[in-house]
Amino acid sequence: MFNFFDINEIIGRFPDKADSTIVDTYLTDEPSASSRLFRVYYPIPRHSHETCEEHLYLLTGKVSFAIENEAPRVLTAGQLVTFERNTVHAITEVLESPAVFFTVDAPRRVPTDVVYVNPDDAKIRPFVTHLEDL
């Protein structure tokens, strides 16, 4: 099986504004790994994922990215960050929009696998809306 994707066309379909923290779309979704594009609209509170490693490649924009207890660092388009499951990470600020990531989660991450360091952060706004649901 194989797939071809027009990444720029998909990025162009993301809305200018959203009620959720991110809007995403799955490119592939297999038990061994999933790949997605997502646009960040608001800072993402400190959280981790229990079920997968994450590989984040910033396609467009600029964000302030924090991981574990390190000071936030600026990620710009063309940069990649990878980390293992249970690694606490956050986007503390969207510095340039649109901030769009290509991500690979291995194995597949179920959408509900977002464990906030501060559970109250889950109440700020919905975490994700799927592009196909808009």
Q: What are the residue ranges of the model-derived segments?
A:
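A short, N-terminal "cap"/entry segment at the start of jelly-roll beta-barrel domains
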Residues: 1-37, 45-46, 117-134
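Short histidine-centered beta-strand/loop micro-motifs
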Residues: 26, 45-50, 67, 73-74, ...
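Short strand-connecting beta-turns/loops that link adjacent beta-strands
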Residues: 31-32, 70, 96-97
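Structural motif
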Residues: 34, 55, 62-64, 88, ...
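Short, conserved beta-strand element in jelly-roll/cupin
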Residues: 39-41, 49-65, 104-107
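Short loop/turn positions at the edges of beta-strands in beta-sheet-rich folds
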Residues: 50-52, 59, 69, 85, ...
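Short acidic-glycine-tyrosine-enriched beta hairpin
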Residues: 69-85
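Ligand-binding loop in jelly-roll beta-barrel domains
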Residues: 85-114
